[in-house]
A protein has these predicted regions:
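Sterically constrained small-residue positions within well-ordered secondary structures
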Residues: 5, 17, 46, 88-90, ...
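Short, glycine/acidic-rich beta->alpha junctions
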Residues: 6-9, 91-94, 104, 220-221
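Short acidic, glycine-rich loop/turn motifs
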Residues: 14, 99-105, 126-131
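Conserved P-loop NTP-binding catalytic core
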Residues: 48, 54, 58, 67-119
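Electropositive, glycine-dotted interaction segments
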Residues: 109-251
């Protein structure tokens, strides 16, 4: 698999997952009518996306559950174990998750539905979204696998005719040899590239000494933490450990 390309989250849709029974939508689309904080907008391929966003709310309003949903999306795409659960107070066993993202300068949307009782992925859809010079968006369906309504589509007819008989206990990209199908191979590459760019940091228990020890030693983890902090603060140019005797303080007269 190729090295992960630059990716940016645009939208997340969640329905009947954890504390969310009704559908919720989280968007990183930038409202260009608002001229404030222009440095917080990333512009690429006619798309405008926020670099940083904050989620605020009282306790038990769903903030942690939303992060859990993103973690589940990442785990499922990377073929890792996930703790996805349907809403406790709903009789509906179908969890619905969707994500729109920018990867390598191109915009994609991936949706899937998971039956927590039968442990089947009953629906998958992958589309590429393009925008013309006038701002009009259009969708190009690469893959549709709808086991409930018996709707199957793929840009490659060789795989489209077999979608109805493929197992559903995992995502399609993990069930077939994608190397035999150009479209599925590209879908898998794009999805894994995107999911590999997702980092979830638990800030609840990080001792200051652990942070200092980490910053003393140059390695891949240190570089990752520094990049994360710099990206989270729009006005921070660098973040590093310096011995006390190397710190220069300019005193105003």
């Amino acid at each position: 698999m190729n090295k992960a390309e630059n990716a940016m989250l645009i939208d997340v849709q969640v329905k009947n997952c954890f504390s969310f029974e009704e559908q919720i939508n989280f968007s990183m689309k930038a409202d260009m009518r608002n001229k404030k904080f222009g440095s917080n907008v990333h512009k690429e391929s006619n798309f405008n996306i926020l670099k940083v966003a904050g989620i605020y709310g009282p306790n038990n309003s769903g903030k942690t559950c939303f992060v859990k949903c993103i973690r589940c999306i990442k785990s499922i795409i990377l073929n890792e174990k996930s703790d996805l659960q349907s809403n406790l107070f709903s009789k509906n066993q179908i969890c619905e998750l969707g994500v729109t993202f920018l990867n390598g300068g191109r915009k994609f949307k991936y949706d899937f539905k998971f039956n927590v009782k039968s442990e089947d992925y009953i629906y998958e859809k992958f589309v590429e979204i393009t925008k013309d010079q006038y701002g009009n968006e259009s969708e190009d369906d690469w893959l549709v696998k709808d086991n409930v309504n018996n709707i199957y589509h793929c840009k490659e007819q060789d795989i489209a005719s077999a979608l109805s008989i493929v197992a559903s206990n995992n995502l399609l990209i993990h069930l077939v040899d994608v190397n035999k199908f150009k479209t599925l191979s590209e879908i898998k590459r794009i999805l894994i590239s995107f999911a590999s760019n997702i980092d979830i940091i638990n800030m609840n228990n990080i001792p200051i000494q652990k942070t200092i020890d980490l910053m003393k030693n140059k390695n891949e983890l240190q570089s990752k933490v520094v990049d994360f902090i710099k990206n989270a603060d729009l006005y921070l140019d660098d973040f590093k450990y310096v011995n006390i005797d190397k710190i220069v303080i300019n005193k105003k007269k």
